[in-house]
Regions:
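Internal intein/HINT superfamily modules and their associated LAGLIDADG
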Residues: 5-300
Length: 300
């Protein structure tokens, strides 16, 4: 352009190249981006910038993927946790409260379990229609104890799922600030949420002979455990219990809720597991065995 400064000439040159790129490559850009190619890769191949490719995609109604979406190589129902309106969603929200984590920076939801309980990760995968792999990580100690240190892990990349979980109280670094999500979980679904939490952070202890005994232990903040007891009492009446501070020397609010009276424990566990459609297989088996133990003692 005669008589103009270099910056102006460069500006008009870019506009002209943009028009030429649109005229020649728009359909190719849309197809290749839809097929999974990045804007930078497409731009390099046609002599354009990734920014121009993004602009063309947006101009034609296309959705520019987030970093989390690019990381995600597997199908996923991102809005599974948007509204907690089914037993399955309430259960897995509780399980995430216990054993899951969210990372807003990496836009990642992570759930890990000891390898024997890896079936829980497969159940969550199925629930949220995910094709992400469950990976097994082993810490080798050079002896027969190696298998005891195997961990199964499921990572789901989704900014929407992270945001939904945070909106329901499943926040980063939640250990010392967990509270019951009354606003998110409707009353009829609250026992399923508690069962999910119990399957993650509760236990049915074994007796001296290695058999499940009718008792239950739940770990959490004192405030959260009080709220669990309040929900339980409104459904089946007061439950006899005791509290034990887990590590008093650490000066924090992590507490153990003990339901040690056998009949009370079975009543609590029956409320959690009766007619349940989603649960940890190992915990369900222990509940059945402990209930049978009490039944045999009452009716030999």
């Amino acid at each position: 352009m005669i008589g103009c400064c270099p910056a102006t000439a460069n500006f008009y040159g870019r506009k002209q190249r943009g028009r030429e790129t649109r005229a020649k490559y728009t359909q190719e850009i849309l197809k290749r981006y839809s097929d999974g190619e990045s804007t930078d890769a497409i731009g390099r191949s046609i002599g354009a910038t990734g920014g121009l490719v993004k602009t063309i995609v947006r101009e034609n109604g296309g959705h520019i993927k987030t970093i989390a979406e690019w990381k995600r190589k597997h199908a996923l129902n991102e809005r599974f946790f948007q509204t907690i309106d089914t037993e399955e969603k309430a259960y897995f929200l509780g399980f995430m409260y216990a054993d899951g984590s969210v990372n807003p920076v990496k836009k990642t939801v992570c759930l890990s379990q000891a390898e024997p309980d890896a079936d829980m990760l497969l159940k969550l995968k199925a629930a949220c229609s995910s094709a992400a792999p469950v990976r097994i990580y082993r810490r080798s100690h050079g002896d027969a104890s190696e298998n005891r240190h195997a961990t199964a892990m499921l990572n789901l990349h989704s900014s929407s799922m992270v945001e939904d979980l945070i909106s329901h109280g499943c926040v980063p670094n939640k250990t010392f600030k967990t509270r019951f999500p009354f606003d998110s979980v409707p009353t009829p679904l609250r026992r399923h949420f508690i069962r999910g939490y119990f399957d993650g952070d509760g236990s049915i202890p074994l007796g001296a002979r290695g058999k499940p005994m009718p008792s239950a232990v739940v770990v959490g903040t004192k405030e959260f455990l009080d709220e669990i007891l309040m929900v339980t009492a409104s459904a089946i009446g007061e439950i006899k219990h005791t509290f034990h501070v887990r590590h008093p020397e650490r000066n924090h609010n992590i507490t153990q809720l003990h339901i040690s009276t056998q009949s009370e424990a079975v009543r609590f566990l029956w409320w959690l597991y009766n007619d349940a459609s989603v649960f940890m297989d190992r915990k369900m088996s222990r509940y059945i065995a402990s209930a049978q133990y009490l039944k045999n003692r009452i009716m030999p």
